[in-house]
A protein has these predicted regions:
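A structural signal for conserved, well-ordered secondary-structure elements
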Residues: 1-792
Length: 792
């Protein structure tokens, strides 16, 4: 790069950085477009809308209520991945949607959960079930009569999903609008029989005795997927899909009440989190400058750009930010720092080996690429799986994590490279600006592996032992929060309006004293004097004590205090989704590492190290009695990301060293050397991330502290695992386990026995390296087509 070009690059970088920071901080135009203040936040940070539904039928079954909660959860995720749906009492369902303030608009858009069915034009005797009015369709007789005649071919519960959207017509390349239906296994069979018998006829979709649409059957639909075509606009398609989804609930619901609720953590939660983030970021940048000099300045610019881009993107894509979302951003900052540390440590190593500064910069970026790429792609794969299969908190975390990974790779591999080369081009040639790696004494980690393994076993077993003790003493192994265990909701109408800060300081202590619950969750109903206080499940005696305490302390009217049992906001189905998502994500990471490193032992060691960190942090939750709720899921997923990233950095060094290994070098010495070479990266990355979390812990509100404390333990544990466990574990697997098995690596053969494995040849080293369309125009009749058959 020429000097003039370098000056241009630096000027452009400065201008873009200032512009992005201004956009993220203040925003553009009168509405502040792009500003962080416009980011949609969750119920915990900014409040939202609360809607309570009542089941129409008396005494609905627990199974139907659970199924309805799960389906409603999926339904409201279109507004926010952080929306919460839970059971209230035996026949009510509460829906809480963050970031919105108009309850009526949500109710209109969400639709009234009623009955849905699909009916044929006529019954077997030829009696008409519905007729056209010119502008629509009406039932020709009562729905009860239609049911008795056997004309109902599908019920709402036979519909698995419905999505409205646009597609390109095959016939004339015009834009068409349709609703895509996915049926259950039972619905697939029913609809196949019905459409086969009614080709050329209409099947009407009836919602609460009103005909929404009456598409014509073009062909037998046997694949369980269909499209309703002929819509005049995408809004019409989405509206019909919305009615079908809400009508597919297991039970009919009616709105009982709706309200706007304030932030659960209060406004100070956002301000303290922002302040903690800024302070932490400044400390991290100063640390990087002290450790890496000029490259540290470049890292600071990259981190500032990372933060600004993430905030702007969160705003642009309307992603809801909650505590778990903040976890994803913190993990992203850690990975952004990690990428820069890997690069700059490599540059200093190259300078120490006698290369010129220019050659060292080029070689540093080149050699660091594989570790950065593999570490980030592995975590990105996990986040995409969690995004795909997860729900609620898991999905929200996955969105912010995926965003952070993509942005961190861009700032480290693109921005940092351009700025570093530009600085060199304008005259920063002296190695004193970059530093030189110090020669470290090689640590005999592998030789002391038994000691480290024993320490790890003790740490891992401490969790189950503590769980058993608490289970016998308290009856619960873990200190479950309301998110997981459910509890009691007490609604109180006070004599005066109280803000959340006043509620926390005056009301919450009274509730904690009476109930002994340290995880009280008060929520203010905006525009009223009402406060909803959620606690653990209270007995009738405890409820009466709480009522008396509130009356005595605040002189409230006893008749204005109501209590209701509530279910967990994380339903069993959501927990199932989370577990399945994590298992599949882990398998995908294992397969990717196996593919990239050409040795299953690398992948197996990485997963074992991952489980080690998760179990140690779980032990901390048990011993410290930290409440297990939504933030628990986010914390564990963050630990998984850190663990796998740190492991891959060391394995990348081992892979590189194996490619140039001499026949005389002992494998144990090679692993020890690689661990020592990556020690700087491990320490610096964990220190910088630890700083961010410590500041968050010091300045944050109580809920944030409960999230930050286990995360700090996880970071420390991750550093220990990276240095003391991963390399030694791979060495054991390489030399003791499967030494006689074939190794997947460029057609080479595995070592026949343990002794030969100690002198593995370098040649064994792994290489581095659906829709069917109707084509109908506006005004024409709608029709059913087999989506699955068309895709084939």
């Amino acid at each position: 790069m020429k000097k003039n070009k370098g000056i241009v690059v630096l000027l452009l970088t400065a201008i873009i950085t200032v512009f992005l920071c201004y956009t993220a901080g203040i925003g553009l135009g009168p509405t502040g477009t792009g500003s962080a203040k416009n980011i949609k936040t969750g119920l915990d940070l900014s409040g939202g809308v609360s809607i309570t539904y009542q089941a129409k039928e008396s005494n609905p079954s627990a199974e139907d209520m659970s199924d309805t909660v799960y389906k409603l959860q999926k339904r409201v995720e279109q507004y926010s991945t952080e929306a919460q749906v839970y059971k209230e009492g035996s026949d009510r369902i509460a829906v809480e949607i963050p970031g919105v303030t108009d309850a009526d608009a949500i109710l209109n858009d969400l639709g009234k959960p009623g009955s849905l069915c699909f009916i044929t034009m006529t019954d077997d005797d030829g009696n008409a079930n519905f007729s056209s009015t010119g502008s629509g369709y009406v039932l020709a007789r009562s729905l009860d009569e239609i049911r008795e005649s056997g004309s109902v071919v599908l019920e709402g519960t036979d519909v698995k999903d419905a999505q409205g959207g646009a597609f390109q017509s095959d016939k004339n390349s015009s834009r068409e609008y349709a609703v895509s239906l996915t049926l259950t296994d039972e619905g697939k069979t029913k609809f196949a029989d019905a459409t086969e018998a009614n080709v050329g006829k209409q099947i009407a979709i009836v919602y609460d005795n009103q005909i929404l649409s009456a598409p014509k059957v073009n062909e037998a639909i046997t694949g369980g997927q269909a499209q309703i075509t002929g819509m005049s606009s995408v809004e019409e398609a989405q509206n019909l899909a919305s009615y079908i989804r809400i009508g597919s609930l297991s039970i009919e619901l009616e709105e009982l009440r709706s309200s706007v609720v304030a932030a659960q953590l209060g406004e100070e939660a956002i301000s303290t989190s922002v302040m903690a983030g800024l302070i932490g970021l400044v400390i991290v940048i100063i640390f990087m400058i002290i450790m890496y000099r000029l490259p540290g300045v470049v890292a600071g610019v990259a981190l500032i750009l990372y933060t600004a881009i993430v905030l702007i993107t969160l705003n642009a894509f309307d992603i809801t930010l909650t505590l778990p979302g903040i976890a994803g951003i913190i993990l992203g900052i850690g990975m952004a720092v990690d990428a820069n540390v890997i690069i700059y440590a490599r540059i200093q190593e190259e300078i120490a080996s006698g290369n010129s500064v220019r050659a060292s910069i080029k070689s540093g970026f080149s050699k660091a690429f594989s570790a950065i790429f593999d570490g980030n792609i592995t975590t990105l794969i996990a986040s995409l799986v969690l995004m795909w299969l997860g729900s609620g908190t898991v999905k929200g975390f996955a969105y912010t994590l995926a965003l952070g990974i993509v942005v961190s790779m861009f700032t480290a591999l693109v921005v940092s490279r351009f700025v570093m080369n530009a600085l060199y081009a304008v005259g920063f040639h002296d190695e004193k600006f970059y530093g030189r790696a110090k020669q470290r004494k090689v640590f005999n980690v592998v030789g002391k592996r038994k000691v480290f393994f024993i320490i790890s076993i003790i740490l891992i077993l401490s969790g189950p032992v503590a769980m058993a003790i608490h289970h016998n003493v308290d009856g619960t192994a873990l200190n479950y929060a309301l998110d997981f265990s459910g509890g009691t909701a007490t609604t109180v109408t006070f004599n005066e309006d109280m803000d959340i800060k006043q509620i926390d300081s005056e009301v919450t202590p009274v509730v904690e004293e009476v109930t002994g619950d340290k995880n009280v969750q008060p929520t203010k109903v905006v525009g009223t004097n009402q406060v909803v206080i959620k606690t653990r499940t209270l007995s009738q005696e405890e409820r009466e004590k709480l009522d008396n305490a509130l009356v005595e302390k605040f002189n409230v009217d006893d008749s204005l205090i109501t209590t209701e049992s509530i279910s967990s906001t994380v339903s069993s189905e959501m927990r199932r989704d989370a577990v399945i998502a994590v298992i599949i994500a882990t398998i995908c990471m294992l397969l990717y590492i196996w593919f990239r490193f050409k040795d299953i032992r690398f992948a197996t060691s990485a997963v074992v190290a991952l489980m080690h960190d998760v179990l140690v942090v779980l032990g901390f939750y048990v011993i410290a009695r930290v409440s297990v709720g939504n933030t628990f899921i986010a914390c564990m997923l963050t630990i998984v990301g850190y663990s796998i990233n740190g492991t891959i950095v060391i394995f990348d060094r081992i892979r590189e060293a194996l490619a140039t290994k001499s026949r005389t070098e002992d494998l144990k010495d090679l692993v020890n050397r690689c661990i020592t070479q990556t020690l700087t990266r491990t320490l610096y990355t964990n220190i910088t991330t630890f700083i961010m979390v410590v500041v968050l812990y010091i300045l944050g509100v109580s809920s944030i502290k409960e999230f930050a404390a286990p995360l700090m333990v996880g970071i420390v544990c991750g550093a220990y695992t990276s240095v003391c466990i991963t390399g030694a574990l791979w060495y054991v697997m390489k030399t003791k386990i499967g030494a006689k098995a074939a190794t997947v690596s460029n057609g080479t053969k595995a070592i026949a026995d343990t002794k030969k494995a100690e002198q593995v040849d370098s040649s064994e080293a792994p290489a581095d390296g659906n829709t069917a369309k109707s084509g109908k125009k506006k005004g024409k009749k709608k029709s059913f087509k087999d989506k699955k058959k068309k895709n084939k």
